[in-house]
């Protein structure tokens, strides 16, 4: 989809760092520590990960395993204490805050449990908001196309409050897709939905990957949701502890039960290698 850019230099026009071709997300030795001394908390303990473009990855783990911190560091919402993060080949760890903000607006899509739609804006305006914030032309045809993809034709002039929870999450997915981002980060996107509606939303994310070539990284606690992904990576104590490829909800639930019981299921080095380019 061609978009006219503003005169301001956008993050996706920056020269790319030397990342591995074909990768959407790369984390190298990422650590995140909160506090100092005896009271320090190591939320991430040296995470290495490489996720190819056009894949759907779910991240699971027990409470306190580092899932939220992983997503925040990978998406540029939090800065690692050590290590590097690349999105679409661009090193983001050392970017200044304003450049990082512009990069998120132009090259990352977000889908949250709480939808995060602005109630005073129409559905169309909510979908176009990332383009507006990024200083790009707000083409109403792009909004119509994105809404059609998620099955919301004819809803452009509605307000979020006039829609069901499932429809609001569809709007959030359309908003995430409108900039054709390098990666979509989804944080518990079905947590507030009933089972049937959750399946519809997950089907849209799956379609975005399989048919549109999007890359999705989803944090979830639900094995049934994770089963929609190509692979499920498990975090424990701030490090990857195992993975399941094309697993059923039952297989994923069994692995989660083992983690919750404190069983390590595999070394991080193996997870990082298999989750890379060869995946």
Task: Mark where each language-model region is.
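Extended, compositionally biased low-complexity polar/Lys-Gly-rich tracts
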Residues: 65, 187, 273-279
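Pre-NBD coupling/linker segments of ABC/ABC-like ATPases
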Residues: 2-19
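Intrinsically disordered, low-complexity terminal tails and inter-domain linkers enriched
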Residues: 14-20, 262-278
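Conserved beta-strand-loop-alpha-helix hinge in the C-terminal portion
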Residues: 239-263
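ABC family nucleotide-binding domain
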Residues: 22-229, 235, 240
């Amino acid at each position: 989809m061609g978009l006219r850019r503003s005169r301001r230099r956008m993050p996706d026009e920056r020269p790319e760092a030397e990342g591995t071709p074909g990768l959407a997300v790369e984390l190298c030795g990422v650590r995140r520590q909160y506090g100092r001394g005896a009271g320090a908390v190591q939320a991430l303990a040296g995470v290495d990960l490489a996720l190819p473009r056009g894949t759907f990855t779910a991240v699971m783990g027990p409470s306190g395993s580092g899932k939220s911190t992983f997503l925040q560091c990978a998406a540029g919402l939090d800065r690692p204490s050590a290590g590097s993060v690349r999105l679409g080949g661009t090193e983001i760890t050392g970017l200044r805050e304003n450049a990082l903000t512009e990069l998120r607006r132009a090259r990352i899509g977000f889908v949250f449990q709480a939808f995060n739609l602005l109630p005073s804006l129409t559905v169309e305006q909510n979908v176009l908001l990332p383009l507006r914030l990024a200083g790009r032309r707000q083409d109403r045809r792009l909004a119509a196309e994105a809404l059609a993809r998620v099955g919301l034709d004819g809803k452009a002039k509605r307000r979020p409050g006039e829609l069901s929870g499932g429809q609001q999450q569809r709007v959030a997915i359309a908003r995430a897709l409108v900039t054709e981002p390098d990666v979509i980060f989804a944080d518990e996107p079905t947590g507030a939905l009933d089972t049937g509606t959750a399946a519809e939303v997950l089907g849209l994310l799956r379609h975005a990957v399989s048919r549109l070539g999007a890359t999705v990284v989803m944090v979830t606690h639900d094995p049934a949701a994770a089963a929609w992904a190509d692979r499920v990576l498990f975090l424990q104590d701030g490090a990857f502890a195992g993975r399941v490829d094309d697993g059923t909800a039952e297989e994923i639930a069994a692995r989660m039960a083992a983690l919750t019981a404190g069983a390590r299921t595999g070394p991080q080095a193996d997870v990082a290698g298999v989750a890379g380019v060869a995946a």
